[in-house]
Every structure is written in structure tokens, then in C-alpha cells.
A protein has these predicted regions:
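Outer-membrane beta-barrel transmembrane domain signature of Gram-negative proteins
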Residues: 189-200, 216-288
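Surface-exposed extracellular loop regions of Gram-negative outer-membrane beta-barrel proteins
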Residues: 114-134, 249-262, 272-303, 426-437
Length: 549
């Protein structure tokens, strides 16, 4: 009933409502301006969205552990020894005697006496004798050598002090003489005597900020025939660490200072006295990944007068790790004024009779290369360098009855490429190769007389069960051009053929202190010529025993 009354009331109220009071439906609208919506300027997002996994924050606990002292009783007892098989300690040998005999009536004797391993001292005495008695070139190709050497060194916390002395004598002949000259046969013999002595001290220190040095005094008396040369030299390298600054690290500042006094006397000629002063400062450091060494090579030359001739060359070497611990590239600049001496001439060509002591000046040397290493078993190096050399020595044959050599000097530009490779398989096998390739360009000489354009060496060493030790060596040189005659307008030339020399040997240790050795040289038995008209000995072999004590 109440719902009916409520509905009737709504109907009655609705009858009195109107939508609008006006009955006129005509309306007018005045437009003031066009409507323009205001929008935010659009901007392109340049980065891609990154979806990151939410990282929950680590809970931060505020509880504390109350410390509590725990009483412990220390118990000291001996550590029991391990039950191992006890073996006798092996004392490595340092002394031995070696005797042998060869197919060219070649006696060999060697004696090496050295102290055992010691942390305070080392000393020793060595002697070697070798002689040939062949029938080659009417026995004039034979030789006799004696070599004795002694040394003493002491080691302490301050450094190493040592003394060395040696004497070597070599008797041989001008066996490349003309067969028709009977007078020459009476005067073919030559004897080289060389006495050397050295005293040195190398300081050591475990303090990085302490200055250290390596100082040595050297003397030698070198004589061949009537030519005598004496040399007195002292040199010292002083070096120390430099604190890092800016981006430079591992700095080492050093300087090598040297004094060299040389005298030369030949027959009745006036003695030639020369002084060489050297000063080579260096600064080695690391910048980022580069290792740099920079400095100067300085030589001041006095030729017996008061006039001093200075020669200064820059030195720079930079290395860069191309591949970490595998490959490194390097390059730089070098150059130096070098002393020519009787000793260096004869050690290069012992058949020289006219001694031209004109010094050599390497004006500049540019070099670049790469070193590579594969693990601990193989390494290699490849280098190319260019040198500009003043007074480059060249050996030419004289026209005397001995067929001896003399030296002429010329300006030279030399391009050299070197390749070297070494491989080792544990102690079982070791193989090495070295090759040099040259391109010469001389100012006045048409050929690089007696200089090869290619030379190579290969060596192999093997270890078979620590009892048999074979080894193999190969040496090769390309053809060479030779000149006979001092006149620049009237001389003859020849070609020295390319050659290779193969040598092999074996050491068989059939007892712990006794071994058998065999060494064979020039296995191909080719009497090639390193120096014009001086063929080497043919096939020669020596065998014998070595006793270790």
C-alpha cells in the first residue's frame, strides 16, 4: 500500500515539470576564434628500452653476536716423517777429462777442473789442446792450438767480485800460397798469441732506491808475427730506479762510462796510440703498454794528438705487446762509432797481412721486428734493419806469393733481414734455425768482396733416455765475389761457390761418469772456400772418452 502511495506521488510531481521555459527554439552563437588544442611537443627516444631483472635488496640485520673467550690448550708435537724411499743425493759433475783421436792424425785433450756448486765461491782451471797432421796441401793446412783459462769469483750480500785470465796460442800457415814459390814455403808459418785478463765487480742490493753498478777492467795483449796490440779498458754501468710520475712507470736511469787505451806496433813503424771515451746515458720506462728505452751513444776519439773527435748518435727502442704474452713488435734507431783493431781483423780473417786500422762509423741504423712465443716450447724473431756505414771493411787478396789479404774501406748501405726460430720438446729435442739475408750498396766498389748475401745455420740436439745425446749442425753460405789486386783500375775477380757444411756427433753415456763421444765434421767432404784459395779440411772425425769426476 505504501509503495502505491509513493509511486502516485512521483507521477503527480512529474506532471508539473517542463524542459525549458522558452517556447522559441531559434538560437544564435557568436564565434570568437578557432579552437586550437595545446599539445606537449613530441620527442623521439633515442635509446632502446632495457629490461632488467629486479634486484632484491639484501636484508640488513641488526643483531650482534656477543663475543665470548674460549679457552684452548696449545699442544706441541713433532710432525711424523713421511715414509719415502731414500735415495742417494746426486752431486752434479763440474770437472772432467776428455781425450780423443781423429782420422787426420788429430790428437785432442781437454781438462776442466772446477769447484762444486757453492754459494760463496767459484773457481776453475781449463785447458784444451788440438792438432792436425794431415797430408793436405803438403801438410801446410795443419794447425796446432793451446788454450788455458783460469777464473775465480766470490759472492756476498754486497755483490760479485771476479778475476779471469786466459792464454791462447794458434799455429798455422799461409797454405793458400802459390805452388811455384819455393821461397814462400819457408815463410808460411804464423803464430797468434792472445793473453787476456779481467777483473770485475757487480754490486747488488735488495733496496729498490739504491744506486748499483757493474764495473770491469779488461786487458789483452794480442800478437801475430811482428804485429803487437795492447788494450787497456775500464767501463762501468751505473743504474738506479726512478719513482713513477705522471703516466711513466718502472723507470730506470742508467749511464755506461768507458775508457779504452789501445797501442799498436808493427815492425819498425811508429806506434799508433788511440784513446776512446764512451758515454751512453739511458732512460728505460713503461708508458701505458709501451716499453721504451731512449738515450745517446757517445764516443770521443783521440788519435794520438790533442784533437778530439766527438761522435754522437741517438738510441731509441720501443716495444709494443701485439698479443699479450705471445707476440711483440719493436722498432728503433741506433748507431755508433766503432774501434777497428788488430784482434778483430785476425779473428775475422787470420790470413790478413796488411793491418788497416781505420775505425768504422755506423752513422745510423734503423730496425724493426717482431718476436713471437708459443707456450714454453717455441719462439721466433723476424727483424729488418738498414745501416749507413762509413769505412766498411772489405777483404781483398793481395798479389804476394802467400796469397794473403788486405783491407779496403768504402761507404756502404746495408739492408739486412734476419729470421730465427727455436723449438724444444721438453729435454728430448731442441731445434734452432737462424738465417740472414743481405743487400749491399757500396759507393765505389762494384761488389761486396768476400761477403755472402745469404747465410744460414741449423742445429739439433736430442736426449734419448739420458744416455744417448746425438746432435746435428748445418751451416751454409751463398756465392761470393772475390777481388785480387790493390789497384782500382787493374784487378782480377773470381767467384767463390756457395757451400754448405754438415756436422754430426753423438755422446753415449754408458756409465754414470764415463761416456764415449764421436764428432764428424764436413760429412759431405767438400773442400769449399770461405776465403779465396784457402779450401777447408775435408771430412774429419774425432772419437774418444770423457771421464767425469
Amino acid at each position: 500500500m505504501r509503495y502505491l502511495i509513493l509511486i502516485s506521488g512521483f507521477m503527480f510531481c512529474g506532471m508539473s515539470l517542463f524542459a525549458q521555459a522558452r517556447k522559441d527554439t531559434t538560437n544564435s552563437v557568436k564565434i570568437i576564434q578557432t579552437y586550437k588544442p595545446t599539445l606537449i611537443e613530441a620527442r623521439k627516444i633515442e635509446t632502446l628500452p632495457v629490461i632488467e631483472k629486479p634486484k632484491p635488496a639484501a636484508p640488513n640485520y641488526t643483531y650482534n653476536i656477543e663475543p665470548k673467550k674460549v679457552k684452548t690448550d696449545k699442544t706441541v708435537s713433532n710432525i711424523p716423517a713421511a715414509d719415502l724411499y731414500k735415495t742417494e743425493e746426486f752431486n752434479y759433475p763440474s770437472s772432467f777429462v776428455k781425450v780423443g783421436y781423429g782420422n787426420m792424425k788429430t790428437p785432442l785433450a781437454e781438462f776442466y777442473l772446477n769447484n762444486k756448486r757453492d754459494n760463496k765461491y767459484s773457481y776453475g782451471l781449463q785447458y784444451r789442446f788440438l792438432q792436425t797432421n794431415s797430408e793436405l796441401n803438403k801438410t801446410f793446412a795443419d794447425f796446432t792450438t793451446h788454450h788455458v783459462k783460469g777464473y775465480l769469483a766470490s759472492y756476498s750480500t754486497t755483490g760479485e767480485f771476479g778475476l779471469e785470465a786466459s792464454y791462447k796460442q794458434n799455429k798455422f800457415n799461409y797454405y793458400g800460397y802459390k805452388d811455384t814459390s819455393k821461397i814462400a814455403e819457408k815463410n808460411l808459418g804464423r803464430t797468434i798469441s792472445n793473453f787476456e785478463a779481467k777483473a770485475y765487480f757487480n754490486s747488488v742490493s735488495d733496496k729498490s732506491n739504491k744506486i748499483k753498478h757493474r764495473t770491469a777492467f779488461n786487458f789483452y795483449n794480442y800478437q801475430i808475427g811482428k804485429a803487437i796490440e795492447n788494450d787497456y779498458a775500464i767501463s762501468s754501468k751505473i743504474y738506479g730506479n726512478v719513482s713513477d710520475f705522471n703516466d711513466l712507470e718502472n723507470g730506470i736511469l742508467s749511464a755506461t762510462i768507458g775508457f779504452d787505451y789501445t797501442t799498436f806496433q808493427h815492425l819498425n813503424q811508429k806506434s799508433l796510440n788511440r784513446i776512446f771515451l764512451t758515454f751512453d746515458p739511458r732512460f728505460d720506462f713503461k708508458y701505458d703498454v709501451l716499453n721504451v728505452s731512449a738515450g745517446l751513444n757517445t764516443t770521443v776519439y783521440f788519435n794520438g794528438s790533442d784533437t778530439a773527435q766527438p761522435f754522437i748518435n741517438p738510441f731509441i727502442k720501443v716495444t709494443y705487446p701485439l698479443i699479450e704474452n705471445i707476440a711483440t713488435v719493436y722498432g728503433g734507431v741506433d748507431g755508433r762509432y766503432k774501434k777497428q783493431s788488430l784482434k778483430s781483423i785476425i779473428q775475422t780473417n787470420q790470413f790478413t797481412s796488411n793491418y788497416n786500422l781505420t775505425n768504422i762509423y755506423e752513422n745510423i741504423k734503423l730496425f724493426a721486428g717482431i718476436t713471437a712465443k708459443v707456450g714454453s716450447s717455441a719462439d721466433a724473431v723476424f727483424e729488418i734493419n738498414y745501416s749507413d756505414v762509413t769505412n766498411m771493411p772489405l777483404f781483398i787478396s793481395t798479389q804476394d806469393s802467400f796469397n794473403s789479404f788486405t783491407i779496403i774501406n768504402d761507404q756502404a748501405n746495408i739492408l739486412k733481414f734476419t729470421a730465427a726460430f727455436n723449438y724444444s720438446f721438453s729435454e728430448i729435442a731442441r731445434i734452432g734455425f737462424t738465417g740472414n739475408f743481405y743487400n749491399y750498396n757500396f759507393k765505389t766498389q762494384p761488389q761486396p768482396w768476400q761477403l755472402p748475401t745469404i747465410e744460414a745455420k741449423v742445429n739439433m740436439n736430442f736426449n734419448i733416455k739420458n744416455k744417448v745425446y746425438p746432435h746435428f749442425d748445418l751451416m751454409a753460405m751463398s756465392l761470393q765475389k772475390q777481388r785480387t789486386g790493390l789497384s782500382e783500375t787493374n784487378y782480377s775477380t773470381n767467384t767463390i761457390n756457395a757451400f754448405y757444411d754438415i756436422s754430426a756427433g753423438i755422446d753415449f753415456r754408458f756409465r754414470p761418469k764415463l761416456s764415449l763421444f764421436v764428432q764428424a765434421n764436413n760429412i759431405m767432404a767438400t773442400r769449399y772456400q770461405r776465403w779465396y784459395n784457402y779450401p777447408v779440411l775435408g771430412f774429419n772425425a774425432i772419437g774418444g772418452l770423457t771421464f767425469i769426476f
